Regions:
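Short, structured active-site-proximal loop/turn typified by the sulfatase FGly-forming signature C/S-X-P-X-R
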Residues: 46-91
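Beta-strand elements within well-structured catalytic alpha/beta cores of enzymes
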Residues: 30-42, 57, 82, 129, ...
Length: 191
C-alpha cells in the first residue's frame, strides 16, 4: 500500500513539475503554475455568486473539483501537505499549534517558530523548483517563511494580517510582470 501511495504521489509531483521542464528557457510560451488557496472558500461558492475572474482562471487553467483534507483538517497541516505531497505525520506540521519534544512549541502565531526550517520536513514544491533552477515565489504559503533544507522561494512574503487584498494581488501581478529571466514560473499564494 505504501508503494502505491508513493507511486501516486510521484506521478502527481511529476505532473506538477513537468510544465517547468522546457528545452527553451526563453520561449514566450513557457508555462506558469499559480497555486491559489482561498482559505475557507468552499468549492461551490463560485457558482453561488458572480466570480468572473475566478471563472476565467478555472476555464484557462485547472480547478479542483473537490479536496479531501488531511487529518487534522487545519490550515497549516493541509497547506504544507499540498506543498509537499506528504501527510502531516510525515512532514511534521501536525496542527496549527503543537509541541515537539526536540524543537519546542510551534504556533502559527509565533513568527520565530514559523520561520524555523527545522519544523518543516519533506520538500515543498518551491524547494524542488529552486533546486532545478526554476524561479519560485510564495505569498503567505505555509512553510515559505522558513528556509526548508536551507532554501526559500526566490520571492516570498512573511505573513502580515494587515496586508490588503489589493496589495497582495498587486505583488503577484508584479512577479508575473518581471522580465523573463527574473519571473517566477511557480507561485504559491494563500489568500
Amino acid at each position: 500500500m505504501k508503494l502505491v501511495t508513493k507511486s501516486i504521489l510521484l506521478l502527481l509531483a511529476l505532473g506538477l513539475i513537468f510544465p517547468f521542464l522546457s528545452f527553451s528557457q526563453t520561449a514566450t510560451n513557457d508555462k506558469y503554475v499559480v497555486m491559489l488557496s482561498l482559505d475557507a472558500f468552499r468549492w461551490d461558492y463560485s457558482t453561488q455568486t458572480n466570480t468572473p475572474n475566478l471563472d476565467k482562471i478555472a476555464k484557462e487553467g485547472v480547478k479542483a473539483k473537490a479536496l479531501i483534507p488531511c487529518y487534522p483538517s487545519k490550515t497549516f497541516p493541509n497547506h504544507y501537505s499540498m506543498a509537499t505531497g506528504l501527510h502531516p505525520d510525515h512532514h511534521g506540521i501536525v496542527m496549527n499549534s503543537f509541541y515537539d519534544s526536540t524543537l519546542g512549541y510551534y504556533s502559527m502565531k509565533d513568527r520565530a517558530a514559523v520561520g524555523n526550517g527545522a519544523f518543516y520536513g519533506g520538500e515543498p514544491i518551491w524547494v524542488t523548483a529552486e533546486k532545478q533552477g526554476i524561479i519560485s515565489a510564495s505569498y503567505f504559503w505555509v512553510g515559505s517563511e522558513a528556509p526548508v533544507k536551507g532554501i526559500h522561494p526566490t520571492y516570498w512574503k512573511p505573513y502580515e494580517q494587515r496586508s490588503s487584498l489589493l496589495s497582495r494581488l498587486d505583488t503577484v501581478i508584479h512577479w508575473l510582470s518581471l522580465p523573463l529571466e527574473q519571473r517566477p514560473r511557480l507561485i504559491t499564494w494563500y489568500f
